[in-house]
Amino acid sequence: MKIGILLSGGVDSAVALYQLKNEGYEIVAYHMKTMKDEFFLNRQVKHKICCSPSDTVDAKLIAKTAGVPLKVVNLHEIFKEKIITYYLQEYTRGRTPNPCYFCNRFIKFGYLMDLMIEDGVDVISSGHYARVVDGKLLKALDKEKDQSYFLASIEKERLKKIVFPNGDKTKDEIRDIAKKAGIHVHSKAESQDLCFIPDGDQKRFFEEQGIKIKSGPIFDKYGKKIGEHTGLINYTIGQRKIGVSAGERVYVTRICADRNALIVGNEKDVQSDKFSVIDFNLLVDIDKNFEATVKVRKNSTEVPCKVSLENHRVIVKTTMPVFAVAPGQAAVFYRGDIVIGAGIIEKIL
């Protein structure tokens, strides 16, 4: 069997490659480049990011040391079309985008996966922390590193051709394997920031794309102006540090793109127990009305809920109020370790 592995240049995918090769599979590594190298020249990278020129250097050395062929794939145009354009549009609409969720669907396990299959690859692998069992997506055993939230966008029929070798291991175990195997990136830092905003300067990035960021009013829930924001792209639902003094702790409760305004309120005002979800990706066979738990952010606590499909939208009713349900973010549904499905939060009901 021929396995194509997404080799990022980091320790996780390097160890995944190492494990699969030791199991005797024929391996071909693929390293994707989402931005041109010159894009990074005049940017000071604050934290480790993926898909940088240094990652390409590391990926080449990992593949060479392992004795497997490596294909470097330039995905600049499709990445701009599917991810960057979407990211810009969502923020200008006052929503909070989730580019990693869509990158997994459209780029890594979409466009690139199709290219790999055209090359004759039978199975696709990566260093993600998750599991695929009998065609179902499951959480990783290491719940702190679990990445099933971002992988829940993958189309159901593609899961049967995907394997995640790291899903049953902890990060410490992965680093230990890498160190013992002499893999040079065994202590490499994890990626933290967006690959297309390596310096973390959102304002600069938007203005480079021709979108001017404007300041605007901040209103309390009664309509009284209490301050000025620095541009809607700098805020998300539930954010507390907004630079105003309101006499009490306040949070962003609404982002009004049509008025270029923020609405703030107290903690109770930013809690919701009913919301709608669009672009639902169902990963298991289940009735259109079902019970599950839901996560509305990568690091949020799962909350029990009832889910129903109504007029091509999923309506979610949680058993308790959920903090900071942000339109544009992914809502991912679970039963135990199994991912039931996922979609994009449309609005609070």
Curated annotation (Swiss-Prot):
Annotated catalytic residues: C103 (nucleophile), C195 (cysteine persulfide intermediate)
UniProt-listed Enzyme Commission number(s): 2.8.1.13
Record's function text: Catalyzes the 2-thiolation of uridine at the wobble position (U34) of tRNA, leading to the formation of s(2)U34.
Gene Ontology CC terms: cytoplasm
Alphabetical keyword list: ATP-binding, Cytoplasm, Disulfide bond, Nucleotide-binding, RNA-binding, Transferase, tRNA processing, tRNA-binding
Catalytic reactions on record: S-sulfanyl-L-cysteinyl-[protein] + uridine(34) in tRNA + AH2 + ATP = 2-thiouridine(34) in tRNA + L-cysteinyl-[protein] + A + AMP + diphosphate + H(+)
Protein name: tRNA-specific 2-thiouridylase MnmA
PANTHER family assigned: MITOCHONDRIAL TRNA-SPECIFIC 2-THIOURIDYLASE 1, TRNA 5-METHYLAMINOMETHYL-2-THIOURIDYLATE -METHYLTRANSFERASE
GO biological process, one term: tRNA wobble position uridine thiolation
Subcellular location field: Cytoplasm
Principal cellular location given in the protein's record: cytoplasm
Family per record: Belongs to the MnmA/TRMU family.
Taxonomy of the source species: Bacteria, Thermotogati, Thermotogota, Thermotogae, Thermotogales
Stored InterPro entries: MnmA-like, MnmA-like_C, MnmA-like_central, MnmA-like_central_sf, Rossmann-like_a/b/a_fold
Enzymatic class: transferase
Keyword Glycosyltransferase: no
GO molecular function: ATP binding; tRNA binding; tRNA-uridine 2-sulfurtransferase activity
Keyword Electron transport annotated: no
SUPFAM superfamilies given in the database record: Adenine nucleotide alpha hydrolases-like (SSF52402)
Region (Interaction with tRNA): 145-147
Annotated site location: Interaction with tRNA: H128, Q329
Binding residues annotated for ATP, in chain numbering: L6, L7, S8, G9, G10, V11, D12, S13, M32, G127
Disulphide connectivity of cysteines: C103-C195
